[in-house]
Structure formats: structure tokens, C-alpha cells
């Protein structure tokens, strides 16, 4: 009986050990499966991160790519452009373009500026001097004839002639009235040379004109 009990106990102990081994194996398997699942999850996370990073890089490349294409269209050739013309051909000379003066408004404005800056010189008309008519009271006396220092035969011939009216004499204003800006040169009068048997009318024509209010030569009173 004791032997049977011992054998049962040994069998139970072995069964327990077997169960424990099974449990340990199961736990090991579960741990290994959990480790595999963890690694698989980690791989999925890494893959997702790599895909997200790749997507962002692709978006950046898509944004940069059209700008690079536009630059490549504007500057298609990076190297120097070869000259197709031969070196012995001279360049064409450019003839200067001559613009006529009537097309330039600045040139047309120069004469107007000159006209405004330098006014035109206006000539003043010669003033008309008053003419006094000859009256009978204007006559020479014997004392005036003596002052002329004329020869005696000429004076005697004048004495026997009747008095005649003389042409009107021109009255000149004093020199202060004349304009200083435009001086007028008067002709130099020629002195009369008395001749023998010369009438008084011809002699008076050669007399010098008297300036100022002094009256001209007068006829001789007989």
C-alpha cells in the first residue's frame, strides 16, 4: 500500500512539474508573441513616420519644382552663346538722326524768351516844332544892318527895295527837351558868303536858323 501511495505522489509531482513546464512554455510563447507584436507595432510606427516624412518632402519638392522650371525657361543656356557672325564683318554704323528745328518746342520758345528779355527798340517820332508866321512888325532897323557888317553897295541896294514878307521860320525847343537816349544830329549850317548885287531874299535863305525864342532875321525898314 505504501508503495502505491508513493507512486501516486511521484506521479502527481511529475504531473505538476509537467504542468509548470507547460505554463512556463506558454508564458514564454506569450512573451515571445508579445515581443513580436511590439516589434511589429514599432515597425508600423517607424513606417508611418517615414511615410509622413516622405510626403512632406514630396510636397516641398512639388512647391520648389515649378519655380525651378520657370528659372530654367528664362535662362535656358548657362554657357556663353557662340557668335554666329564671322569676325571680319564690321558693325553697322548708326547714322545720327537729325531732328528739324520745328519739331522741337524748346527751340521755338527761345525767340519768345529773347523778345521778352530784350524788348524791341521803338523809334520816337521827330517832334513837330511850332512855326510862327511872319508879321509886318518883324523888321530890321538901320542899327541891325550896321551890326551885320555888310558892304555899303549891298546895303544901298537893299535900302531902295520895298519890304517883302519872308517865309515862316521854324522854332526849335531848348536842348533840355530833347531825349538823351536818342540824340538827333542837326545838319551843320553853312555860313552865307555875301555877294555883290545879291537880293535880300537870297541872302536870308543862307542865314543860320536861330535857336530858342529869339525871332529870325527881319526885313529892313526904309
Curated annotation (Swiss-Prot):
Keywords: Milk protein, Phosphoprotein, Secreted, Signal. Residues 1-15 form the signal peptide. The modification Phosphoserine is found at residues 30, 32-34. Pfam families: Casein. The modification Phosphothreonine is found at residue 27. GO terms for cellular component: extracellular space. It is found in: Secreted. Mammary gland specific. Secreted in milk. PANTHER family: BETA CASEIN (PTHR11500), BETA-CASEIN (PTHR11500:SF0). Important role in determination of the surface properties of the casein micelles. Belongs to the beta-casein family. This is Beta-casein. The gene is CSN2.
Amino acid at each position: 500500500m505504501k508503495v502505491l501511495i508513493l507512486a501516486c505522489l511521484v506521479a502527481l509531482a511529475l504531473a505538476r512539474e509537467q504542468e509548470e513546464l507547460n505554463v512556463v512554455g506558454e508564458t514564454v510563447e506569450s512573451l515571445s508573441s508579445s515581443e513580436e507584436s511590439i516589434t511589429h507595432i514599432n515597425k508600423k510606427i517607424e513606417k508611418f513616420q517615414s511615410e509622413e516624412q516622405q510626403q512632406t518632402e514630396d510636397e516641398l519638392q512639388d512647391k520648389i519644382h515649378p519655380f525651378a522650371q520657370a528659372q530654367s525657361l528664362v535662362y535656358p543656356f548657362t554657357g556663353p552663346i557662340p557668335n554666329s557672325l564671322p569676325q571680319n564683318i564690321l558693325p553697322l554704323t548708326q547714322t545720327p538722326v537729325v531732328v528739324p528745328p520745328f519739331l522741337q518746342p524748346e527751340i521755338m520758345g527761345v525767340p519768345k524768351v529773347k523778345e521778352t528779355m530784350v524788348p524791341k527798340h521803338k523809334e520816337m517820332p521827330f517832334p513837330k516844332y511850332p512855326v510862327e508866321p511872319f508879321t509886318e512888325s518883324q523888321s530890321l532897323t538901320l542899327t541891325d544892318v550896321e551890326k551885320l557888317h555888310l558892304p555899303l553897295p549891298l546895303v544901298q541896294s537893299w535900302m531902295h527895295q520895298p519890304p517883302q514878307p519872308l517865309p515862316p521860320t521854324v522854332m526849335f525847343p531848348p536842348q533840355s527837351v530833347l531825349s538823351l537816349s536818342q540824340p538827333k544830329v542837326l545838319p551843320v549850317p553853312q555860313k552865307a558868303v555875301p555877294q555883290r548885287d545879291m537880293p535880300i531874299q537870297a541872302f536870308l535863305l543862307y542865314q543860320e536858323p536861330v535857336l530858342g525864342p529869339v525871332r529870325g532875321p527881319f526885313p529892313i525898314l526904309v
